[in-house]
Amino acid sequence: VTETALHCFLLEKLSSFHRQYPGVRLKLTSGTTPNTLADLKAGKTDLAVVTTPIREDSHFRVTLVKECQDILAGGSNYSYLKGKKVPLSEVQQYPFVSLAENTMTYALYKEFYASHGLILKPDIELATADLMVPVIRQGLGVGFIPRELVKKELEEGSIVEIEIEEKIEGRHICMVEDRQKPLSVAARHLIRLLKGKEPA
């Protein structure tokens, strides 16, 4: 599971699953989307829950389970930008916080910047989205992060949403199965729950 998928979708579902099947033990591993999918393909996991974008692979059956929206976020020291529509070219003037270069999120935003004739140049690269939250909250830079990950900080005002002129495409949390691999009964029940076909 990727960290964003865990926090924005899976934890709540796992809680329901655990209530329904208290005797079933689950082993969760976390990583980037490419690493998580590589583990699935290698047969190390039964199932992957990741965020888009993902590379197409005929081995995989992909089910979109939830939409999530990234926002440009900054600490309260960027509150003067709140309510304005800032062009992406202006965003480049501020220190930028990003996930590491080996992530699909980095690739997504590198492409997003390039499509607007700009080059993505992060000042701080982090391994996980979870680490981005305190770095942004402390005012060390601005960065694109799923709204759901910073919901509490947005409500309390320690992080502000900075609107940009360019449209940020919505992303999805996906459940990915290996078409070749038979699933255990527990995995089949979990998949049904994730797809919303089993009562929570």
Task: Identify the residue ranges that each predicted region occupies.
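Hydrophobic hinge/microswitch elements
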Residues: 32-37, 41-44, 51, 110-162
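Flexible hinge/capping segments at coil-to-helix
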Residues: 59-96, 100
